[in-house]
């Protein structure tokens, strides 16, 4: 997931709010939860997040990504699955992921009701190249391994 930065909204990451510049988005713009939702959907061969939360729907404007995640967990029948591991890469030059890693991992652990040891979050930069390097945007990639419970 990738979003352009915006000074008109707070920063949401992994369901947590930080008092700094957030993202331009129809929802709260939480790149971590958006990428996690897409990874969950993809792991069970479902359509992408935009299919379930179309940005053209007025009812979805400003929706919290934690609410999106709850719906996605129902759609994929999460209670019948077990998370083996989640690997999250946040690509940004706006902040240091290492300064927030523990609280982000803790919140994802709570949201998914899994052991924190199954979650890995790392930060990467683009060495000042492109939109992310120019601090205009940030992105997140998520890989998840699930098995039947």
Model-derived regions: residue spans:
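C-terminal edge-of-domain segments
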Residues: 132-149
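Short, conserved loop-to-beta-strand elements that form functional interface hotspots
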Residues: 87-96, 101-132
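RNase III-family endoribonuclease catalytic core
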Residues: 2-101, 112
